[in-house]
Curated annotation (Swiss-Prot):
Top-level taxonomy: Eukaryota, Metazoa, Ecdysozoa, Nematoda, Chromadorea
Annotated domain remarks: The Zinc finger domains 1 and 5 bind single-stranded and double-stranded RNAs. The Zinc finger domain 1 binds DNA in vitro.
Acidic residues compositional bias, start-end: 812-824
SUPFAM superfamilies, per database record: beta-beta-alpha zinc fingers
Main location: nucleus
Biased composition (Polar residues): 346-362, 472-482, 1201-1211, 1251-1273, 1624-1633
Region (Disordered): 72-252, 271-364, 451-499, 538-601, 681-712, 785-854, 882-905, 975-1069, 1083-1227, 1246-1273, 1333-1478, 1569-1608, 1624-1671, 1769-1822
Keyword Transcription regulation annotated: yes
Keywords: Cytoplasm, Differentiation, DNA-binding, Metal-binding, Nucleus, Repeat, RNA-binding, Sexual differentiation, Transcription, Transcription regulation, Translation regulation, Zinc, Zinc-finger
Zinc fingers (C2H2-type), renumbered ranges: 413-440, 651-672, 856-875, 1274-1297, 1668-1694, 1826-1858
Full protein name: Signal element on autosome protein 2
Length: 1968
């Protein structure tokens, strides 16, 4: 092996392909004719190389290279030209490919495809292939439309001609491929074709480096074209000499399948040269794409055809057929699999070459075939199968698609004929061999292919007809069209394909579609280049290749024509196809050789008139109907119109209007688009014969003017106008090249045969935007619409006037309100429209654009919706449809009969006419439904009309839609027709139902109006109807309900009944609708009920509806029903209820019947009402104590709902019946008006309430019980739990007991009996059953009773039972005084609980006076229910008397009595609720007795009887009693509970000595926490006395009357100590207090001891009150223990106990000192006389100063004196500085706040200056020691947390006023502030208040500089020492300063202040 040469330039780029040609390949090349053999070998080598995919660097031995170069040297110049073209193509910017996602991706995947360009045949071949690939990979620049690069004049060479289109740089690659496949052998063509596909795939896969385009090759002069085909080199060994810098690489030109130019090669070559020149200029120009690319010079073509045409021309048609005039078509006999169209024209020279090289070529083709097959498989697996083909396609020049390879779809292998998607190319080939659609279209394609496409206007003249015409053979087996080109073929007809083409092959081979323009596109060999690629890709997706290729190539050509670059608009070519024109208007129609050569390498894209000489108008509509074609069209249109590179290109599915970003996405969408598939199915099922499509005028690229909607509308309008879908004449918009596709060409592709699915909705958005939309029919407008501006669009105006009918449909279409695809069916039917229809549609479309999505337009109201689902939803509610529904039926027949009279025989024409019937229906707006579904499949007009009509009816209830469908049905598929029929049937049914409903509604409304005069119409409650109205009266019941509702409302004014509701159970007692006594468990279907009547109705009077019951109680307002309620119920039971039970409105007929029955029942009911009204009047007369408002309420009820009154006034017997009868099953459900109301009202009422009256009736009749209806409790039957409302009970039962509604109704919950009275206890259920069994009364429901009910059910201590009798008597007396009306009830309540129950039971059973007589009206109920204490209603409090609670508290004190009555009252109610009735009564009696005693001796009564009742020393500590007396005497105003104090003194907390302060604080806190103003003054006692008399007023009076005293209240230590000294200092505390207890003011006789004793628990074990508040800091604690523990460390308490408390103690010394202090305190207790004097002073003192003076009089040793003094001083300072609206929360609760709170007044002490949270409730753990850091304090704590809190809050050193002033020189420290001011402050104080400052001081010694002002810091210190109160003005500054210097105590104070005052946004303050 000689030296290995590395490839450079293009060869280097081909390296990725690993194109190492084996020696044998080189030898083969040697054996072959330089051109043909070389091209073949090169192709084969390239394929083989691609297949080999050798990774080794592409290196060939020198010998190999030499051989190859020698062989290719002869044609080197031509190869250079080819290479140049290729390189130019390769160098073409990839940008143009952007639009083509597939191309772009492929180019990215195969960037190196361009590397294959090598000089020589190999180079030419490989370059052609590679350039082809490159084209695919890197689409040409915008100037390079679809590979229409301007090639150098040398491009006319065969290599250039075949290797690459003269107009495309891919031509080189095509030449390569062509030459490769240009073998003489037919097999060679087959193999070559396949190999090209596969090579293209492989090469595309392998060539991943377009980045390195081969160095531009010198453009060879066109003169070289005359030479034989230059050898196409698949491998380029050496880099070609760089092209002249001044010479620009030829711009890429459209790569079309090899077009065989006939013998007139010179002329054709000239044309090619001209085209090339024009292309160059176009390349230089911005819009080179618009300029037709010159085909290879005719001379080159001729030479190619004459010379070894097989070599170069034989280049597989798969590669874009070079401009060579002749392509040799291998005999069709060749296996289709290997069949590759011969690329060499059947020239003698080519044949000779073929003969010489036949063996080699065959062998090479075999290799190539294998390679290509393998590559194709690999590509298919990798999704690149399509890409290489497009590359090849782009590479090849205008070679006509000789043998369309199975079009590998871009990722989708779709049959071009039937649009069937296949998994891979092989399957596609197989499918296409047997594809009926393809076979059907094959003849047409053959004819089309035989005809040469019209040359572009600018293209050089097509080769003269003398040029050998190519015979086009389509091999089904391979799916490739093998076209043998005869130079004799005419320039236009057979310039590319000879009319002598074997139509058998084409017809038999579904792949002929390629020749139609699709196959070659699919065939990268046939159609290469970016444009070709995109087109091919689309064509692949555009299963119908013939048309899409034409469209796409036409687009490519139309790039010359000014159409957007297909690369820029990937679907642009599709647009042409989508448009009826399918770019039929493309230069093909021009029939100019240049255009033909340049613009339409793939003849199909030639003018619509000629598809390779085929008159598309002559083409059967089946092609257009072919879904594949449509797809391809749409795809082609979209790609051609928008170009892949055009990002703006919008690809819109014409079927569903969905826009996608790329062709590939659009294709994928087609796979899933149901509408599209429907149309495809329609087209596939009945593919109407191809009709001529009108030439597509220049398609306005992406013009939205002709939107899809307009296309659809236009199609519909055209159909409506019944304009035959005759292909419009090539009224083509002049493309920039003055190209006008022939209508022939357009029609077949535009949708002649295929309903322009692609055009109508397959075409891209741009297509839709373009005229494509107008052209598209409703569903299937021909792709023409999407093509370049359709001439149809221009023609549309003419067409429209032709058949413009004023049909609503047409108007809607014009308005674009009608969407052709109003229904999926409409789409399908529209798809049926022929191309002519499409054309018509297009014309119409232009005139009418759809503003929205015309597909989804309501045919009734013309409203456009965004989706079919919305449209359907809209139809359901369309008012117009409803109004027109009746008319629609009439209009439907016209629409149905309306059939396209002018419908052409072709299905498309029929489809187009099908819309016309839609115009006929204009009779009804529904007929104008825009949903004209045109099915591609042709349906006989009659059948279609029938289907359409039925379908329209099914699809749209609206006649218009039906009409549309009927008309469109002619084109509808059977499925569409069936769907339309079904839809129509559904619509008819809906309309009928609606009509019936309307009729029923009218009737009902009429009935209601008639009844409205009497009763507001209301749907009878089935149960209510049964119960309330006899079955015969069921309808009447409805009216009654309606009539009763107004009546019921007045009746139920107390609980205004909710407005009558519809529904069975919906009617609640509030509506007076008696909840039928029939339990739901028993509820039956309407029939059963009607037959059986109500179950329990007879047993109980029915609700107001149960007029018979009311009739018993004559209701004047209801005179219609005379039957008594019971009788009425019996009637219900005996009578079958009509189906009325269901709301009559539910069933119109039933409703009518019900209304009738209601009317009758109402008449009867009125009679009963009259009777009931009378009864009710009588009952009302019996109502004695009924409140006036209730009387009015009942009167109103009488007037409005006699039934209610009747029930209200029903006899007790009725009540008994109700009690006996189970509540209505609805009772448990209906809770709107709780039975509690009825219970309250009716419990006291006679039976009618208890009878099956509705809750409303019962309520109205019954006097409101003392408790409100909302307060009525109910008992769960299962667990006997009481709930506040029936609803809650029901919920409970359903949730907990898992009961069903029926079960609940069967066993409804019963109201909890009111313990207050028998009536209340009876608590009739809120059911028809009336009062529940008295057992419920027995049940203690008082748990939820109000305080007013407490007397009967209040909780009383067992001890109180002994006194129960006396208390009951007292209560009875007071009740009689308070409520004479309640005398009976009160007596009953006063009786033992069983007795009231019995009474209740009796009340339930025996007829009782009306509830009003028995029960007081709700206003007095608070009084009545409570123990009747006359003045304050303390009857309620007595039951609830907090004294009773205080009895339970550890330290009974005035706190309980002084506590606001509100607080006191709730306690007793709770106790009464949860206690036995005996206890309640006992408590009530006690309360009454206490009241009397309080009146007699308020102080002692309160203290002994209520507060402590210390008569029993065992129950109460004598200390507490003594202290209380002292308080009464004013001696111990400031002393807390002595017991607590003593307790604190006796026991220490945390091992600390318990000073009196601590004990006192604990005591105080206990008292306060218990809520006892333990230190209340006598005034406070008097306040309590007042409270007892006026509990509601006392809370205010007490604090107001004794604010001073309250302020003084908290000096417990002082008062206590003084008192102890006065009493017996040496004596034990207990003894000391015992004596005072004996001393009681004679003026105050003690209250009855039994009461106190029974009502009180021993105070020795006080129960922690709800408020466990620290007396010092007011912090609320959770338990007494917590409180005591808190007191031990509470700074306030400590201060109160020890004035020097803050001093840091020396632990032991401190303890000892504490003990000593305690002893001193005890010893220094003032003597009794001092105490007396002190008490006198306290009585006189009105301010804190007086208290301080009194304290000062005490001996100095007394800590209490100091504390009091300090506290008073603090109070004064707080008064001065407190500017806040509320007491500074953070401060140590200045005592000034205490007076405001009566509760806290007793608990608050002068020492408690901080609020609970302020005083350090929140600890801080910044202290690690448990000792107070101040030795003076001497405190130690059990935890660091407590110590920190102590340091912050409790330490005297920190809280002492002026403590920050140094006490000694050693204690001073100089503070220097930012204002240079200097202050001396106590070091100890600073260290105490701030750990941070302490740290600083430790570091800095005696000086400390602070970055703040002295004023600010002083404020901080003053706040800390309580000199200054925190206010809203200073809070901000204080907060900042405290945080800055870490004064935790101040920080907490500030936080507390903010929290208490809700101070969220502190005001601005002085900045530090």
């Amino acid at each position: 092996m000689g030296r290995e040469y590395k490839f450079t330039g293009i060869a280097a780029k081909l390296n990725p392909l690993n194109c190492r040609l084996k020696l044998e390949i080189a030898e083969d090349l040697d054996e072959r004719v330089p051109t043909t053999s070389t091209s073949c070998s090169v192709a084969s080598v390239a394929a083989a190389t691609a297949t080999i995919n050798t990774t080794a660097p592409t290196v060939l031995t020198k010998s190999e290279l030499q051989k190859t170069l020698q062989k290719t040297s002869s044609s080197f110049s031509s190869s250079l030209a080819t290479t140049t073209t290729t390189s130019s193509h390769l160098n073409a910017p990839v940008e143009s490919m952007e639009g083509h996602s597939s191309l772009a991706s492929y180019s990215h995947h195969h960037p190196s495809s361009s590397h294959h360009h090598h000089p020589g045949q190999q180079q030419s071949s490989s370059s052609s292939s590679s350039s082809h690939l490159q084209d695919f990979q890197s689409p040409p620049s915008a100037s390079h439309p679809y590979y229409h690069q301007q090639q150098p004049q040398h491009q006319h060479q065969q290599a250039q001609q075949y290797g690459q289109a003269t107009g495309s740089t891919n031509g080189g690659g095509q030449q390569q491929m062509t030459s490769m496949y240009g073998g003489n052998d037919y097999d060679q063509h087959q193999l070559h074709h396949q190999n090209q596909q596969h090579q293209a795939s492989t090469s595309t896969q392998q060539f991943h480096h377009p980045q390195r385009p081969p160095p531009p090759q010198y453009d060879q002069p066109s003169s070289s074209t005359g030479s034989s085909l230059p050898p196409l080199h698949t491998v380029r060994y050496e880099q070609l000499p760089p092209p002249p810098s001044n010479q620009r690489t030829p711009t890429q030109q459209l790569q079309y399948p090899v077009k065989v130019v006939e013998a007139g090669g010179q002329a054709y070559a000239q044309q090619v040269q001209q085209a090339q020149q024009s292309n160059r200029s176009g390349a230089a120009g911005v819009n080179s794409a618009l300029q037709p690319k010159p085909l290879p010079p005719l001379s080159s073509i001729t030479s190619i055809s004459s010379s070894a045409a097989g070599s170069s021309i034989s280049a597989p048609s798969t590669s874009q057929p070079s401009t060579t005039s002749s392509l040799i078509t291998s005999p069709p006999s060749t296996s289709s699999s290997s069949m590759a169209p011969r690329k060499t024209p059947p020239n003698a020279s080519s044949s000779s070459l073929i003969k010489r090289q036949s063996q080699d070529v065959q062998e090479q083709q075999r290799v190539d075939f294998e390679v290509a097959r393998n590559v194709s498989q690999i590509m298919s697996k990798n999704g690149l199968k399509v890409m290489h083909e497009p590359l090849l396609t782009g590479s090849l020049p205008q070679l006509a698609p000789l043998a369309p390879l199975p079009p590998p779809k871009s990722g989708v292998y779709q049959c071009p004929n039937c649009n069937r998607n296949l998994a891979n190319a092989r399957n596609l080939q197989r499918h296409r061999q047997t594809c009926g659609s393809a076979q059907h279209a094959a003849p047409q394609l053959a004819a089309m292919l035989q005809r040469s496409p019209p040359p572009c206007a600018s293209a050089p003249p097509v080769a003269p007809p003398t040029a050998p015409s190519t015979s086009f053979q389509h091999h089904n087996s391979t799916g490739n069209l093998t076209l043998s080109y005869s130079s004799s073929s005419s320039r236009h007809q057979s310039s590319l394909y000879s009319p002598q083409l074997e139509h058998q092959d084409l017809v038999g081979n579904p792949n002929v579609m390629l020749s139609d323009g699709y196959e070659y596109k699919d065939d990268p060999m046939l159609y290469q280049g970016p444009s070709g690629l995109s087109d091919s890709i689309w064509s692949r997706d555009d299963s119908f290749h013939s048309e899409p290729p034409s469209a796409s190539h036409d687009q490519l050509d139309m790039d010359h024509l000014g159409f957007p670059d297909p690369l820029q608009d990937p679907l642009h070519h599709l647009d042409s196809f989508d448009s009826a024109d399918h770019r039929k208007e493309t230069p093909r129609e021009c029939h100019e050789p240049d255009e033909l050569m340049t613009l339409d390498p793939t003849p199909p894209q030639c003018g619509s008139e000629r598809f390779y000489g085929i008159n598309i108008d002559d083409m059967p509509l089946s092609l257009d109907c072919d879904e594949p074609l449509m797809r391809s069209e749409s795809a082609s249109l979209s790609s051609s119109s928008q170009g892949r590179n055009t990002p703006a290109a919008v690809f819109t599915c014409e079927a569903c209007k969905k826009s996608v970003s790329s062709e590939r996405s659009l294709r994928r969408h087609y796979n899933t688009c149901k509408m599209f598939q429907t149309e495809l199915a329609a087209s596939g099922e009945e593919r109407p014969p191809t009709t001529k499509r009108k030439p597509a005028t220049k398609r306005p690229s992406k013009k939205k003017e002709a939107s899809e909607g307009p296309e659809k509308n236009s199609a519909i309008l055209a159909a409506l106008r019944k304009e035959p879908a005759a292909p419009q004449q090539p009224q083509q918009l002049q493309f920039q090249q003055n190209y006008q596709p022939s209508p022939q060409f357009q029609a077949p592709y535009g949708g002649g045969s295929l309903p322009s699915i692609s055009a109508s909705w397959l075409h891209s958005a741009s297509t839709s935007a373009a005229a494509a939309a107008p052209e598209r029919s409703e569903m299937f407008t021909s792709p023409i619409v999407t093509s370049a501006p359709n001439p149809y669009i221009h023609q549309l105006p003419h067409q429209q006037p032709q058949q413009q009918k004023s049909s609503p449909l047409e108007d809607l279409l014009n308005e674009q309100d009608e969407s052709a695809d109003d229904d999926g069916d409409s789409r399908s039917s529209s798809g049926t429209v022929s191309n002519s229809t499409t054309t018509t549609t297009t014309a119409t479309t232009t005139s009418s654009k759809s503003t929205g999505n015309p597909l989804f337009t309501c045919e009734h109201c013309a409203r456009q919706l965004c989706s079919m689902s919305n449209l359907k939803r809209h139809r359901a509610t369309c008012k117009v449809a409803a109004s027109s529904s009746s008319n629609s039926a009439a209009s439907r027949p016209p629409s149905q009969p309306s059939t396209p009279a002018t419908a052409p025989a072709t299905p498309m024409l029929q489809a187009s006419q099908a819309p016309q019937p839609l115009q006929a229906p204009p009779q009804s707006p529904m007929e104008t439904t825009a949903t004209v579904t045109y099915t591609k499949t042709t349906v006989p007009p009659s059948v279609a009309n029938t289907w359409n009509t039925e379908k329209a009816q099914l699809i749209s209830p609206k006649p218009r839609s039906q009409t549309i469908f009927s008309e469109a049905s002619s084109s509808m598929t059977v499925g569409d027709a069936l769907r339309a029929q079904q839809h129509q049937q559904k619509m008819d049914q809906q309309i009928q139902i609606q009509f019936q409903q309307q009729q029923q509604q009218r009737f009902q409304h009429h009935q209601q109006q008639q009844q409205a005069g009497r009763i507001p119409p209301r749907p009878p409650n089935p149960i209510l109807n049964q119960v309330q109205n006899p079955p015969q009266q069921v309808q009447h019941n409805q009216h009654q309900n309606q009539m009763l509702n107004p009546i019921r409302q007045p009746l139920l004014q107390s609980p205004p009944p909710p407005p009558p509701k519809k529904g069975l159970i919906e009617h609640k007692n509030t509506d007076l609708v008696l909840i039928t006594s029939e339990p739901l468990a028993e509820r039956m279907d309407a029939k059963r009920r009607s037959s059986e009547g109500l179950v329990a109705v007879t047993s109980t009077p029915l609700p107001p509806i149960q007029l018979p019951q009311r009739s018993q109680a004559p209701a004047p307002s209801r005179q219609q029903q005379q039957q008594p309620p019971v009788a009425y119920q019996v009637q219900f039971n005996g009578r079958p209820l009509p189906p009325m039970q269901l709301p009559p409105l539910q069933n119109p007929h039933n409703q009518q019947q019900q209304h009738q029955m209601l009317h009758q029942s109402q008449m009867n009911y009125q009679q009963v009402q009259q009777v009931q009204q009378v009864q009710h009047v009588q009952q009302q007369q019996n109502l004695q104590n009924q409140h006036h408002h209730q009387q009015q309420h009942h009167q109103q009820n009488q007037q409005q709902a006699p039934g209610n009154r009747s029930r209200s006034h029903s006899n007790v017997g009725k009540m008994e019946q109700e009690a006996q009868r189970q509540g209505s099953p609805l009772d448990s459900i209906i809770t709107s008006v709780p039975l509690s109301i009825e219970v309250h009202h009716h419990i006291m009422k006679p039976g009618p309430l208890e009878q099956g009256q509705s809750s409303v009736d019962s309520q109205s009749t019954a006097e409101p019980s003392p408790r409100k209806a909302s307060q009525q409790a109910y008992i769960c039957p299962e667990c006997k739990k009481t709930y506040a409302s029936r609803k809650n009970v029901k919920r409970h039962r359903m949730a907990v007991h898992k009961l069903t509604l029926d079960e609940i109704l069967a066993n409804p919950e019963q109201p909890a009996l009111d313990p207050l009275s028998a009536v209340g206890g009876a608590g009739r259920r809120h059911t028809v059953a009336g009062l529940e069994t008295p057992d419920s009364a027995l049940k203690p429901a008082p748990t939820k009773r109000k305080a007013s009910e407490a007397p009967s059910a209040g909780v009383a201590t067992k001890k109180g039972k002994a006194m129960a009798a006396s208390v009951d008597e007292i209560q009875v007396k007071e009740e009689e005084e308070d409520q004479k009306e309640e005398t009976v009830g009160s007596v009953e309540r006063q009786e033992p609980p069983k007795k009231p129950v019995a009474d209740d039971h009796k009340s339930a059973i025996a007829p009782l006076p009306p509830a009003n007589t028995i029960m007081p009206p709700p206003p007095p109920y608070n009084q009545a229910s409570a123990v009747p204490l006359n003045p304050p209603r303390t009857a309620l409090p007595p039951l609830q008397l907090p004294p009773l609670q205080p009895l339970q508290s550890e330290s009974p004190s005035w706190a309980s009595m002084s506590a606001p009555p509100t607080a006191l009252i709730p306690r007793t109610p709770r106790s009464s609720e949860f206690a036995d009735e005996e206890d309640t009564r006992a408590m009530a009696k006690i309360a009454a007795e206490l009241k009397r005693s309080a009146e007699d001796w308020p102080v002692l009564a309160v203290i002994e009887g209520v507060a402590a009742e210390p008569t029993n020393g065992e129950d109460i500590d004598e200390d507490e009693i003594l202290i209380k007396r002292l308080r009464q005497g004013g001696v111990l105003e400031d002393v807390g509970d002595v017991s607590d104090l003593l307790r604190d003194v006796q026991g220490g907390v945390d091992g600390e000595p318990f000073s009196e302060d601590m004990l006192l604080e604990k005591n105080l806190s206990t008292a306060s926490s218990v809520g006892l103003p333990s230190l209340a003054s006598p005034g406070e006692q008097f306040g309590y006395q007042q409270y007892s008399q006026h509990p509601q007023q006392h809370p205010q009076q007490h604090p107001q009357q004794h604010p001073q005293q309250q302020q003084q209240v908290w000096n417990p230590n002082y008062e206590f100590q003084g008192y102890m000294q006065q009493q017996h200092p040496p004596m034990p505390v207990s003894q000391q207090f015992q004596q005072p207890l004996l001393q009681r003011p004679a003026s105050q006789p003690p209250p009855a001891r039994p009461i106190v004793k029974n009502s009180r628990r021993p105070s020795t074990t006080p129960k922690p009150p709800p408020n466990l508040t620290c007396s010092g800091c007011k912090k609320i604690l959770g338990s007494d223990y917590s409180l005591r523990r808190h007191r031990a460390g509470c700074a306030d308490v400590q201060q109160a106990l020890n004035p020097e408390y803050p001093r840091p103690p020396k632990r032991k010394a401190a303890r000892e000192a504490q003990k000593i202090n305690e002893a001193e305190i005890l010893a220094s207790m003032p003597d009794p006389q001092m105490v007396a004097e002190r008490s006198a002073a306290v009585a006189e003192a009105a301010a804190a100063e007086a208290a301080v003076e009194r304290i000062g009089a005490l001996p100095p040793p007394s800590v209490v004196h100091e504390i009091v003094h300090q506290v008073n001083a603090d109070r004064q300072s707080m008064k001065k500085h407190n500017k806040t609206t509320s007491p500074p929360p953070a401060q140590e609760a200045p005592p000034t706040c205490a007076p405001d709170d009566p509760m806290s007044s007793s608990s608050s002490s002068s020492t408690s200056s901080a609020s609970p949270l302020q005083g350090g409730a929140k600890p801080s753990t910044n202290q690690a020691r448990h000792y107070c850091q101040f030795p003076e304090c001497g405190k130690n704590f059990s935890s660091e947390w407590n110590l920190a809190r102590h340091t912050r809050e409790s330490c005297k050193m920190t809280t002492r006023a002026h403590s920050y002033e140094p006490t000694s020189a050693a204690d001073k420290i100089d503070l220097i502030f930012m204002d240079k001011s200097k202050r001396r402050v106590s070091r100890t104080f600073l260290c105490t208040v701030s750990s941070l400052i302490s740290y600083w001081l430790g570091e800095q010694g005696d000086r400390l500089e602070l970055d703040t002002k002295w004023e600010h810091f002083q404020l901080l210190l003053d706040v800390h020492t309580l000199k200054v109160a925190i206010t809203a003005d200073n809070i901000n500054l204080i907060a900042e300063q405290s945080k800055k210097y870490q004064l935790e105590h101040v920080i907490r104070m500030a936080d507390q202040f903010m929290m208490n005052t809700n101070y969220t946004t502190p005001p601005t303050h002085v900045q530090l």
